[in-house]
Amino acid sequence: LIYQDNIDVLPKEKIYGIINNSVGNLRGKPSHSSELVSQTLLGTKVKILKKEGEWYLIQTPEDYISWIDHGGISIMDEENYKGYYKNQYIYSSIQGFAYNSIEKESVVSDLVVGSILNVTGTNGEFYKIEYPDKRIGWVSKKDISPIFNSNDFSGLEIVRNSKKFIGVPYLWGGTSSKGFDCSGFTKTVYLMNGLVIPRDASQQINEGKLVDDQRKWDNLREGDLMFFGYYKDGRRRIDHVSIWIGNGKFIQASKNVRINSVYPEDPLYDRYHMEKYIESRRIIGNETNGIKKL
């Protein structure tokens, strides 16, 4: 009730926002001490549901609802929101920086893979970018690329991108190359290829096409999602997800991003998760209602 007194319902022309930092930390409640429930990346368009003090309740493209502090978001009217991107690119290096000039005199901000950049110009080997809050930065051309058309990539591309993150630490709520949880990892890998999939493993399992629930590994293709969990009170509970990379192996964010095997005789065998294996699903070519193109 104390919080309720501070809630502002925003006028229609101010219900749009774009993430302004390399990583926007999303909280379960409007407080920095609240649990980190997820993250979203620079350039992501969000819908603002309400304002409470210096916090905004937002809805991300994958329909995840959470709180972000005012420093992580730029508020726009509908016209500027829809017309913000002149040329939309994605940051494709794992981590890096935008600079105030092509001479790299000082850093404007850090950048992480998956950041969506608004390219407004070019100079030699650099692109000029504009941030949602109107800051200007310069980024090396080799570090960014046009956003993929989701029809143009294969499971092998998913695997190639997933391996870039080997060794990245586990972070509950993490969806960036600074730290991942299991579903944040799978979500980010697919985002790199222009597909927005749901945030949590329990949501991701509802998308795509079922390809295996009998441990028949020959049914799987590179890039398929593997789901793990347990049954309680007759209900299925999904608590982990990984990516099949072929040859009996999968890649996952568990302790850190690492490769494991489905075969007990393999030194990389992950007994804990394999005892909880539920099923595998194929996203590529089977984009169901919960999957969106970037």
Where are the regions a protein language model picked out?
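Catalytic cysteine-centered active-site loop
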Residues: 170-184, 188-222
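Residue-level "contact hotspot" at macromolecular interaction interfaces
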Residues: 39, 110, 216-219
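Boundary regions of SH3-family modules and the immediately adjacent low-complexity/disordered segments
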Residues: 1-15, 31, 52, 60-94, ...
